[in-house]
């Protein structure tokens, strides 16, 4: 049972808010509202202040000006990328513990019910009944009657099944702890969900479940940031853009926002041109007749008019970024062939775990292939076998003639020397190259000017991803094996990588949970299912239709 939500007037109002970090103004005198049941996407360049808005709403940061007001009964749930310490509980207990107030209310209600069975004065009973009614109302509002069932359903939806409910939370890896942290926030059943990159570390199945849950089960308001374009498009009905010191709202999803933003900018540019033409005429008149006494009144009038005109300013546009892979050397027609490939990993308890067996397939020159499958199917392991990062347990694998393979994974970023600069790192990958060639390659992957002197330990996840890709291209690669290349990249950077891969004349095989990326890029799909590989001779849409995953 889900309690009724807040009524229309119970919104979060952000009124004339101002926040700055040092001398840098994030936004000034900005206003917007979060209405009951609304679905908003928060967008803007890195460092614009998106996460700051979340922290201002939760009270983790203070305003420099303005006001944020909301009903005192409003329950806010905030999911961030800062997981915090988790230990000493099972996965289910950890999720339930986040609803401590709800559980406390349940205990209080039971205690009051027991107390009502005891004789007491009428006044005391009346006071107890009033307190009992208030507690019961809040307990119902928080969804207390189905708390444990909800916690289990959310954990299962995020890929942690009943067999892992009682598993110690500290035994989960970082990515799975992120899922538990997300489950905690969803289970709270808040009035307002603030979600900062909720799809990070989720596979496609969990992303689809989360979309469905937010669409059909959760009736509160949602404000989210996400680098997953399709996730954003399917859920939000309003975009709140943070940038250039302002906050601007657009009705519609992310794709609508992109179109509408361009229309508004063109209109602003046209208005700016007209105003500049008018100002030039007025200033010309003033300059020509300023010295003539007969026109003194007119000149003075026009000077005052100009002083009162509010100048139209054109906000600085985000720099359009683009990189492209150099023309690769031509490989043979058959790039890679696997026959009855199998992989078994040893487990800590001394047993063996079969990841996949009987996997066969052929990758041809120029193909863009996606490897898909449920979490744990062996997608990343298959790519590791292809890239020579691990040996298959059995079967044969043949890399074709003149194939130069480049491999990208999240582990690649961990191997970077944190004390070296971007320039030094690329130089290590191509020691015979001139300074100019190295700088050009760095620039192609958006490291320009002083950026090449940044130390690795100061780079963001997205910057590290770009650097590893740049190092791949330091050699004449014609076969790219990419394991989650879009992780840590924002939407704009994903679009840049997408265009570069679409124009890449070589061969690509990749694992990605970004459905927009897959829809736009791949022309063939390998699905690993129950240890076997099924080829689909068509694009991602074709695969979804043939495999019965149309809702993806």
How does the language model describe each region?
Residues 2-273, 319, 326-552:
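ABC ATP-binding cassette signature C-motif
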């Amino acid at each position: 049972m889900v309690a009724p939500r807040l009524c229309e007037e119970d919104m979060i109002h952000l009124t004339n808010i101002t926040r700055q970090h040092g001398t840098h103004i994030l936004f000034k005198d900005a206003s917007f509202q979060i209405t009951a049941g609304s679905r908003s996407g928060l967008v803007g360049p890195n460092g614009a202040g998106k996460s700051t808005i979340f922290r201002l709403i939760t009270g983790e940061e203070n305003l420099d000006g303005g006001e944020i007001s909301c009903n005192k009964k409003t329950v806010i749930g905030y999911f961030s990328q800062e997981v915090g310490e988790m230990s000493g509980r099972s996965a289910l207990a950890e999720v339930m513990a986040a609803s401590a107030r709800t559980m406390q209310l349940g205990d209080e209600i039971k205690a009051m019910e027991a107390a009502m069975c005891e004789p007491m004065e009428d006044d005391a009973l009346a006071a107890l009944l009033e307190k009992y009614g208030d507690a019961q109302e809040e307990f119902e509002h928080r969804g207390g009657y189905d708390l444990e069932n909800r916690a289990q359903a959310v954990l299962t939806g995020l890929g942690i099944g009943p067999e892992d409910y009682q598993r110690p939370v500290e035994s989960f890896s970082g990515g799975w702890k992120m899922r538990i942290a997300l489950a905690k926030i969803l289970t709270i059943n808040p009035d307002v969900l603030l979600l900062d990159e909720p799809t990070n570390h989720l596979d496609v199945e969990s992303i689809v479940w989360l979309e469905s849950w937010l669409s059909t089960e959760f009736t509160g308001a949602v404000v989210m940031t996400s680098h997953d374009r399709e996730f954003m498009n399917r859920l939000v009905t309003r975009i709140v853009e943070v940038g250039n010191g302002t906050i601007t709202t657009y009705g519609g999803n992310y794709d609508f926002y992109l179109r509408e933003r361009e229309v508004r900018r063109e209109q602003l540019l046209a208005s700016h041109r007209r105003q500049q033409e008018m100002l030039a005429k007025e200033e010309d008149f003033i300059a020509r007749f300023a010295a003539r006494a007969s026109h003194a009144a007119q000149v003075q009038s026009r000077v005052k008019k100009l002083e009162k005109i509010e100048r139209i300013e054109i906000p600085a546009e985000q720099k359009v970024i683009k990189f492209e892979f150099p023309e690769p050397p031509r490989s043979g027609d058959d790039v890679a062939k696997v026959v009855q490939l199998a992989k078994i990993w040893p487990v800590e308890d001394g047993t063996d775990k079969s990841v996949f067996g009987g996997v066969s397939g052929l990758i041809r020159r120029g193909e863009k292939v996606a490897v898909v499958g449920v979490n744990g199917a062996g997608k990343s392991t298959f790519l590791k076998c292809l890239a020579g990062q691990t040996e298959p347990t059995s079967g044969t694998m043949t890399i074709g003639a003149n194939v130069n393979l480049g491999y990208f994974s999240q582990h690649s970023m961990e191997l970077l020397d944190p004390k070296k600069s971007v320039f030094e790192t690329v130089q290590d990958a191509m020691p015979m190259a001139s300074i100019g060639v190295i700088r050009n390659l760095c620039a192609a992957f958006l490291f320009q000017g002083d950026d090449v002197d940044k130390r690795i330990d100061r780079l963001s996840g997205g910057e590290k991803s770009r650097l590893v890709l740049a190092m791949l291209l330091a050699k004449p690669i014609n076969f790219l094996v990419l394991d989650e290349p879009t992780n840590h990249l924002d939407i704009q950077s994903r679009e840049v990588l997408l265009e570069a891969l679409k124009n890449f004349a070589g061969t690509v095989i990749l694992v990605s949970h970004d459905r927009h990326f897959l829809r736009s890029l791949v022309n063939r799909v390998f699905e690993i299912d129950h240890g076997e590989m099924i080829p689909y001779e068509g694009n991602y849409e074709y695969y979804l239709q043939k495999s019965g995953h149309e809702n993806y």
